[in-house]
Swiss-Prot record:
Tissue expr: Detected in sperm (at protein level).
Function text: Functions as a protein phosphatase inhibitor. It inhibits activity of the catalytic subunit of PP1 and weakly inhibits the activity of myosin-associated phosphates.
Region annotated Required for binding PPP1CC catalytic center, displacing metal ions and inhibition of PPP1CC catalytic activity, chain positions: 144-147
Family, similarity comment: Belongs to the protein phosphatase inhibitor 2 family.
Start and end residues of each stretch annotated as Required for binding PPP1CC: 12-17, 43-55
Protein name: Protein phosphatase inhibitor 2 family member C
Stored PANTHER family: PROTEIN PHOSPHATASE INHIBITOR, PROTEIN PHOSPHATASE INHIBITOR 2 FAMILY MEMBER C
GO biological process per UniProt: intracellular signal transduction; regulation of signal transduction
Polar residues composition bias: residue spans: 71-80
This protein's UniProt keywords: Protein phosphatase inhibitor
Lineage: Eukaryota, Metazoa, Chordata, Craniata, Vertebrata
Chain segments carrying region Disordered: 1-51, 71-118, 162-202
Organism, as annotated: Homo sapiens (Human)
Length: 202
């Protein structure tokens, strides 16, 4: 039976082995009263950090050890009212500029004003670019939804055209080919012109 217990390895847990920490506690416990040290040992736990990492984190999961060395980016959200947001940005920048001007010397004043003007111009440029992108997106979205309506109208017009051709074929089955082609050309011209004007409307 001793052979089976010696070949059987104990399961490695998160906590430190009792034998490694228990032996040091036992020797000190024998010196200064074993009951006090046993109580402290029962109340406190010592964690084996390497066992925790090995048990709960695979080797390929080192994403929590990576560090970002990039500086934070300044982001300004665009509000619904484009003109109001431009005014708000100008107001905030001017307030920040006034506080900065009071804190600096007269020699630094000219450098700071240049930097502030360039940063204000840059922020305005970014804001205008974002507003332009938003406007273009909304225009494309409107055109996309109008495209569905245009397709429905085109289907209705095609259906009406087919119905009118069927009615004409039933009424005059013996008509000449020249009359049909002239009639079809006159009908097609207004229909295609109508589709073109409808697709251009926003």
């Amino acid at each position: 039976m001793s052979a089976s217990t010696s070949s059987h390895r104990p399961i490695k847990g998160i906590l430190k082995n009792k034998s490694s920490s228990g032996s040091s506690v036992a020797t000190s416990g024998q010196q200064s009263g074993g009951t006090i040290q046993d109580v402290k040992r029962k109340k406190s736990q010592k964690w084996d950090e390497s066992s925790i990492l090995a048990a709960h984190r695979a080797t390929y999961r080192d994403y929590d050890l990576m560090k970002a060395n990039e500086p934070g980016t300044s982001y300004m959200s665009v509000q619904d009212n484009g003109e109001d947001s431009v005014r708000d940005v100008e107001g905030e920048d001017s307030v920040r500029g006034v506080e900065g001007k009071e804190a600096t010397d007269a020699s630094d004043h000219s450098c700071e004003v240049d930097e502030q003007e360039s940063s204000e111009a840059y922020m305005r440029k970014i804001l205008l670019h974002k507003q332009e992108k938003k406007r273009q997106f909304e225009m494309r979205r409107r055109l996309h939804y109008n495209e569905e309506l245009n397709i429905k109208l085109a289907r209705q017009l095609m259906w009406k055209e087919l119905q009118s051709e069927d009615n004409e074929n039933e009424e005059t089955p013996q008509g000449t080919n020249e009359e049909k082609t002239a009639a079809e050309e006159s009908e097609e011209a207004p229909l295609t012109g109508g589709l073109q004007t409808q697709s251009c409307d926003p």
